[in-house]
A protein has these predicted regions:
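Post-signal-peptide, soluble extracytosolic/periplasmic N-terminal scaffold domains
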Residues: 1-2
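Gram-negative/organellar outer-membrane beta-barrel architecture
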Residues: 21, 37-193
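N-terminal periplasmic "start-of-domain" segments of outer-membrane beta-barrel proteins
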Residues: 21-35
């Protein structure tokens, strides 16, 4: 009995067809594919499931593999999904404590996900319901820095009431990115009152 393993086939670059704005580096890292490595068909069985987990792209049709002598090239058919949002109301009201003055009031929510094609996230929530009161929450996240399985994120929370109370929370985190959307996070934070 003789086992013929056949020729070595290595993974080549990917082709993304469709209107999806996504970096090939991010896509390969997210799907745990490494260009230049030996092609392993079992890696491709879960790709469609992994792509469904992404909030900003959808498969227009199942991916295909193009074979060339010694190379395998995945072809993805991806469409953008709306993952970013903006919601807000801003107004001006008279300030009863200071005659003739006004203050800005409002509630604004802005979420930008994958705006630059690298799966980055920017999230801002601002709320100013009363005079001299501010509530601000900002989150930023950037995965796969320099194509490595590491990401960085930053959180800022600010709450101000009048001139007597100010609370600021800051947090800087580093993530080791695992398969799918899972990660291990290490962070440092500072809280001031």
């Amino acid at each position: 009995f003789v086992l013929d393993k056949g020729p070595l086939i290595v993974l080549d670059t990917a082709i993304v067809k469709g209107n999806a704005k996504i970096s090939e580096t991010y896509l390969f890292n997210y799907l745990s594919l490494k260009p230049g490595s030996a092609f392993n068909e079992s890696q491709y069985k879960k790709i469609s499931l992994k792509l469904k987990e992404l909030p900003f792209v959808a498969e227009a049709r199942p991916f295909e593999i193009e074979y060339m002598p010694g190379l395998a090239r995945p072809v993805f058919y991806l469409q953008n999904k709306k993952a970013s949002q903006f919601n807000g109301v801003v107004g001006v009201q008279p300030d009863n404590a200071n005659a003739g003055k006004v203050y800005v009031t409002g509630d604004v929510k802005l979420r930008l996900h994958n705006a630059f094609g690298r799966a980055e996230l920017f999230d801002l929530n601002w709320n100013n319901p009363l005079p001299r009161t501010q509530d601000l929450k900002v989150k930023m996240s950037y995965p796969f820095i320099l194509g490595l399985p590491f990401g960085i994120d930053f959180d800022l929370t600010l709450f101000k009431k009048d001139t007597i109370f100010l609370e600021i929370n800051r947090q800087l985190g580093f993530r080791y990115l695992l398969a799918g959307n899972n990660s291990i996070r290490v962070f440092a934070g500072k809280k001031t009152n």
